[in-house]
Every structure is written in C-alpha cells, then in structure tokens.
Curated annotation (Swiss-Prot):
Homodimer and higher order homooligomer. Oligomerization is crucial for its stability and function in the endoplasmic reticulum. Interacts with FLVCR2; this interaction is potentiated in the presence of heme. The record marks D140 as: Important for catalytic activity. It catalyses: heme b + 3 reduced [NADPH--hemoprotein reductase] + 3 O2 = biliverdin IXalpha + CO + Fe(2+) + 3 oxidized [NADPH--hemoprotein reductase] + 3 H2O + H(+). This is Heme oxygenase 1. The lineage of its organism: Eukaryota, Metazoa, Chordata, Craniata, Vertebrata. The gene is HMOX1.
Length: 288
C-alpha cells in the first residue's frame, strides 16, 4: 500500500497540472472581485492599466521563452506564431497610450513581482517555464475570449477589435484543437518525478501571484469605501501609490521607465481595473 503513493499523481503532465491546481482554481473562482467584472464594471482609464500590466508580463515571459526555445525542457512548446502576445500588446499599447507609449505605461508592484519570478525561472530554472506558459496561454485561449466580449461591450470599443489585439489569435484556427495539441506536446516533455513536482508547484505559484494581487486590490477597495470625502482623495492616492512604487530594484523589461499614473486616474477606477487583470487569469485558467 505504501508503494502506491507515487502512482497517485496522474502520469500526463497536463492532467497533473489540472489536478494540482484545483484548490487555487476554487480560490480564484470564489473571489469577490469576479462579481464586479461580470457586471461589466470596467473603465477605459482602468483598462489601460490592465493592458500595460499584461504587456510587462508577456514581454518578460516571451523574452525568457526566446532564451530557452532550443532547450529540450521547452522546445516542444515553442509556438511563437500561434501564441506569443507581445506584438499584439504593442498594438494595444499604441492604441491606449499613443505613439510614445513606452514612456507612458505604468508598472505596478504586483506586476514587478510577477516579472521577477518569470526572469528567475527563465534564467535559472528553465524547466519550470512550462508552468507559466501553460497557465497563461491556455487561459488566454479559453476564458480570455469571454473577457474580450465583456470588455468590448463595457468600453464600447470598435467591433473591428482595436485596443483588444491581445485577445485575438489569428494563427489559431480552432482553439479547442490547438489546446489539445499543446497539452499533447506538454506530455512529451521528459522530466524526473522531482522536476515534475516542481513544475506543479510553480503552476500554483503562478496562481498565487495573481491571488496576492487580488488581496492587495481588496485592501485598497476597503480603504476607498471608508474614505469617500473629496478632502481625503489625496491621502487615498498616496496610499495606493505607495503600493505601486516598489523600492526593491528590478529589471524593467526592455529598459522602460517605471512611471506611475495613479495621480491621473481616480482610485476606484484603478481598483476595478486591477480586478479585471486578476479576473482574466482566474476566469481564463478556470475555463481550461
């Protein structure tokens, strides 16, 4: 009986990932912020912040993927034409921030934490990169499509898809079939049981990075509901700003300036928008 314990883990990596992340799936599914997003409570100003955060995250992820594209621990999952989002997000940045978007986009503390982890994995633990690629791209191909429709309606965006290039995968003809292909490729990766367990733990870390963001947003939301008087608006922005500016040195993707835009947007819009960011991950991954 004691020898049956190792066999309790699903043999296929894709199934093992699904099983290992069930608990964090539930946490994300039951998050209060989901109700806000499902009601379409997203503003244009806030959505810009969401897209900027996604740009930083995918810029870091895909830079590390490029560094490891010939590494056997990742090569079978290298689908730049079908999946990579950086070019699409650059289009979205130009739409939302204008031609000088690289000088204008914000870089929040929660995003920095995510980027730091991606850089660490890509450079020192590339065998774990599959966990981040799987959770992000498969989520984008699933629940991300639902979020696109909600955002398009809530923000009254053009039906042509301007400002939403991130959600469009022109080189994926059938999302369901492609996800099946991706999972089958994942299952061909050779790894020891020890490495496999680390991959599963890293997938949980990817979820937890977003749950931490949710907790931060909830705290700011609680503070904002307690401080509604105009005379206190400056103090609220200062509290929020202290959370966005991270004193810890960090490598900025492509050397972009780390500019805060919180002073330009009402806090409540910022809070609701960050909720949208976490909702993208939570809903997208749960749909897998």
């Amino acid at each position: 009986m004691e020898h049956s314990q190792p066999n309790s883990m699903p043999q296929d990596l894709s199934e093992a990932l699904k099983e290992a992340t069930k608990e964090v799936h539930v946490q994300a599914e039951n998050a209060e912020f989901m109700k806000n997003f499902q009601k379409g409570e997203v503003t244009r100003e806030g959505f810009k912040l969401v897209m900027a955060s996604l740009y930083h995250i995918y810029d870091a992820l895909e830079e590390e993927i490029e560094h490891n594209k010939e590494n056997p621990v990742y090569t079978p999952l290298y689908f730049p034409e079908e999946l990579h989002r950086r070019a699409a997000l650059e289009q979205d940045m130009a739409f939302w921030y204008g031609p000088r978007w690289q000088e204008a986009i914000p870089y929040t503390q929660a995003t920095k934490r995510y980027v730091r982890r991606l850089q660490q994995v890509g450079r020192f633990e590339p065998e774990l990169l599959v966990a981040h690629a799987y959770t992000r791209y498969m989520g984008d191909l699933s629940g991300g499509q639902v979020l696109k429709k909600i955002a398009q309606k809530a923000l009254d965006l053009p039906s042509s898809g301007e400002g939403l290039a991130f959600f469009t995968f022109p080189n994926v003809a059938n999302a369901t079939k492609f996800k099946q292909l991706y999972r089958s490729r994942m299952n061909t990766l050779e790894m020891t049981p020890e490495v496999k367990q680390r991959v599963l733990e890293e997938a949980k870390t990817a979820f937890l990075l977003n749950i931490q963001l949710f907790e931060e947003v909830q705290e700011l939301l609680t503070q904002d509901t307690k401080d509604q008087r105009p005379s206190q608006a400056s103090d609220i922005r200062k509290r929020a700003g202290s959370r966005v500016q991270d004193s810890t040195p960090v490598t900025t993707p492509r050397g972009k300036p780390q500019l805060s835009v919180l002073s330009q947007v009402p806090l409540i819009r910022w809070v609701l928008t960050l909720s949208f960011l976490v909702a993208t991950v939570a809903m997208g991954l749960y749909a897998m």
